[in-house]
Amino acid sequence: MRRGFTLVELLVVIAVVAVLAAMLLPVLSRARESARKAACQSNLRQIGTAFRLYASDYDGLYPCNGDRNLWMGRNWRVVLQSYLPGGRMQSLPPGYSQPLQVQHSDVLLCPSDERAVQVWERTSYAYSAAFFHAPEQINSLASVLQGSSCANWQAIVRGIQSLPTVPQSEASLVFPAQKALSAEWLSNHDKFSGDCGFWSWDGSANYLFADGHVKFLRRRQIRPAVNSLPDINLTRDGIAGSDYP
């Protein structure tokens, strides 16, 4: 006669399975986050390619952050759509008073950023102000002393407030391999407040540099952090400056 499992044997098997699951779950979680991080880095590389293609079409100039019609969606994320997989921007006549019709590319969304698609920004990535403001403007911004606070200074570097946009040229780059062009955005995705937000990777972020390479860095590794300003927008000397190492 075949003997079945006893209750004790069954409990032992269940306990072993539970222990194995407890050991494997953190490993699987880390593997999932590593995959998301790699996907995020791939996104930034494609964004870097889009910036280079845009510059090649516009005499070596980088795009503006936005214009006076920013509320209608005319910002850097929109003008790059035509250069990104799955993105598209409808051309409109000058002076057209309606919002642009845009098909957004998923490349602008980090896999770990669950809220980016829900808000007007519709991106997980920031565009360094050094590429759309003159160096003297950036030096003025760098005089902000409380960049780590919750003051609404982020609205300035995002181009929403008064500084005029001055698109910079690729020819002005001095250290392309050391100049951060874009990075994961320190944001809570509030619609307009610009309050302090979170870092996707526990105090670290993926950074795209002007030469096209991507590097995963802790925020204190970016040079403005020495003045308590861990943000690529506030690098002294603008596009001619160096952010890392």
Language model region names:
Residues 23, 32-43:
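Juxtamembrane interface helices immediately C-terminal to a transmembrane segment
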Residues 2-32:
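N-terminal single-pass transmembrane signal-anchor helix
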Residues 40-245:
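Short, well-structured segments within or immediately adjacent to enzyme catalytic domains
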